[in-house]
């Protein structure tokens, strides 16, 4: 299978040459990156100033003309570190042994400076500061238990998004800096913003998948939509219109957060101590740009689906907190889909048909041994597909098939990573123990309905199942389990016609089902929406 990369040819990169999972999927997914950090990193790219060659842009995505002309040039973006903001919000809740003397002293200085700016009775200033600190701590999104600078906020506003910053404790012990200012005399000596430990590159990868998808010929998109029976709307089939709708959706998402939060975060990070932000975010009086990674060019179809599904969530009328959690769930599901589909594509020499795999979904308390066995077998076959794809990707290359490299690839970005994220999403149970199998949670179901059912609309239950199968490879009923058995290469089993009755019950309990008769039901969109290219 052709293994070209986007947005530039990465074959000379050390990560590409040394890691088969990165060669297969892009740079990079990692089991160290939580689902919230995956979303935060993606939105950090969205909100940062970006440039392609000499062309800078501040929109969420490149203008369509720039996208079309984009050829063999890295994407660069200028993320902010927001160390003052993280220090103010997270230091008091961090481990005592992680609080270096310079951190504590600068925290005290920030508090003193903030008190000078507060216009209330002096006796109340300490309480006001504590209230503001607790308010920002309440937006903690990921990294609880880590050093304060490696933690992240919920991505509710642009001013709460920050790049990864790693405190280099070994360097601090060795050189013993005695002031906050000393920490920035040599870039990267005490704080690393380029280590990619927790912001491992997964968010960059998904952003690039969408950009790559928007570059595709509309005729190729339309042919794929028809062949795979995806049933996109006419607007969704035009990359330019879909891109414009995504821009509006992202703008609406960030405008939903109260302006007070943005203003408070900017004030604490930049106004109390402008020097720190200047040292971390600027280089020679210009924004400090960093290079994003790359994705596999063949994954444009997954990227296009992600763009459509994101757009439907952003234009569905959800409040900002629900939008964050829906997007987090979507990103987990998409990552799983990307791992399976790209692996299937690899093993079929690029000829895999959508969906390329099947997930046999059970009810969580399923007692039928046959249904549980098929679900378990579908999970094991998916794991095997990813396992084999990584190994086949090493064949015919100059990479030595080192067992250590393969084990790391399996754990960090391969089938073990797939299983870990699937369990984290609630798509696979039990979290521990044998006979793991696929199930649905109410949260996953609502995300599926939101991204499949037209806004302010409804579709038949049968159509709903067909579209889930087409877009996600998930099957629930006798016909779907039959297709799964065919994919598994095992004898088809005969099941009762009410195998999927539990799904109807789950939809009804969520208020998403309207019964027209005993044989016909409609699945309803859960929210009232406006704008967007949904259908």
Put a short name on every predicted segment.
Residues 169-170, 174-177, 182-429:
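Eukaryotic partner-binding/assembly regions in large regulatory complexes
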Residues 44-48, 69, 92, 112-115, ...:
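Alpha-helical repeat scaffolds in large eukaryotic proteins
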Residues 110, 117-216:
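Extended, Lys/Arg-rich, non-catalytic nucleic-acid recognition/anchoring regions
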Residues 25, 39-43, 64, 87, ...:
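Generic structural signal of hydrophobic/aromatic residues within well-ordered alpha-helices
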Residues 40, 149, 163, 211, ...:
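Generic recognition of cysteine residues
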Residues 362-535:
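C-terminal structured domains
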Residues 1-124:
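Charged, amphipathic alpha-helical stretches
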């Amino acid at each position: 299978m052709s293994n070209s990369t986007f947005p530039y040819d990465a074959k000379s990169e050390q990560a590409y040459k040394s890691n088969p999972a990165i060669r297969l999927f892009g740079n990079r997914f990692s089991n160290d990156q939580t689902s919230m950090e995956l979303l935060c990193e993606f939105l950090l790219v969205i909100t940062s100033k970006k440039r392609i060659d000499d062309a800078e842009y501040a929109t969420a995505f490149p203008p369509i003309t720039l996208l079309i002309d984009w050829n063999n040039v890295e994407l660069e973006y200028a993320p902010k570190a927001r160390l003052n903001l993280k220090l103010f919000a997270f230091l008091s809740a961090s481990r005592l042994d992680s609080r270096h003397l310079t951190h504590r002293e600068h925290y005290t200085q920030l508090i003193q400076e903030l008190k000078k700016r507060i216009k209330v009775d002096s006796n109340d200033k300490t309480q006001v500061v504590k209230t503001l600190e607790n308010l920002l701590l309440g937006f903690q999104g990921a990294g609880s238990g880590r050093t304060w600078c490696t933690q992240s906020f919920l991505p509710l506003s642009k001013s709460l998004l920050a790049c990864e910053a790693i405190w280099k404790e070994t360097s601090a012990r060795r050189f013993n800096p005695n002031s906050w200012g000393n920490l920035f005399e040599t870039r990267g000596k005490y704080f690393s913003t380029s280590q990619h430990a927790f912001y491992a590159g997964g968010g960059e990868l998904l952003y690039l998948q969408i950009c790559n998808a928007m570059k595709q010929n509309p005729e190729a998109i339309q042919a794929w939509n028809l062949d795979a029976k995806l049933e996109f709307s006419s607007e969704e089939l035009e990359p330019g219109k879909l891109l414009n709708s995504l821009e509006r959706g992202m703008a609406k998402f960030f405008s939903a957060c109260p302006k007070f939060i943005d203003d408070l975060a900017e004030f604490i990070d930049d106004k109390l101590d402008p020097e720190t932000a200047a040292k971390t975010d600027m280089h020679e009086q210009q924004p400090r740009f960093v290079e994003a990674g790359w994705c596999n060019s063949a994954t444009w179809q997954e990227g296009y689906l992600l763009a459509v599904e994101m757009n439907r969530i952003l234009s569905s009328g959800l409040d900002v907190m629900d939008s964050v959690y829906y997007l987090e769930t979507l990103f987990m599901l998409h990552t799983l889909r990307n791992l399976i589909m790209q692996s299937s594509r690899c093993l079929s020499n690029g000829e895999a048909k959508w969906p390329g795999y099947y997930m046999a979904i059970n009810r969580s308390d399923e007692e039928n041994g046959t249904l549980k066995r098929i679900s378990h077998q579908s999970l094991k076959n998916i794991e095997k597909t990813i396992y084999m794809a990584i190994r086949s990707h090493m064949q015919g290359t100059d990479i030595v098939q080192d067992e250590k490299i393969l084990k790391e690839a399996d754990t960090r970005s391969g089938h073990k990573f797939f299983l870990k994220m699937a369990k984290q999403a609630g798509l696979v149970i039990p979290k521990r123990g044998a006979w793991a199998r696929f199930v649905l949670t109410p949260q996953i179901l609502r995300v599926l309905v939101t991204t499949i059912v037209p806004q302010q609309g409804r579709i038949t239950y049968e159509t709903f199942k067909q579209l889930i199968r087409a877009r996600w490879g998930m099957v629930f009923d006798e016909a779907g389990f039959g297709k799964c058995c065919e994919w598994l290469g095992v004898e088809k089993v005969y099941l009762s016609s009410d195998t999927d009755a539990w799904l109807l019950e789950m939809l009804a309990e969520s208020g998403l089902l309207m019964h027209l008769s005993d044989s016909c039901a409609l699945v309803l969109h859960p929210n009232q929406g406006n704008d967007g290219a949904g259908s």
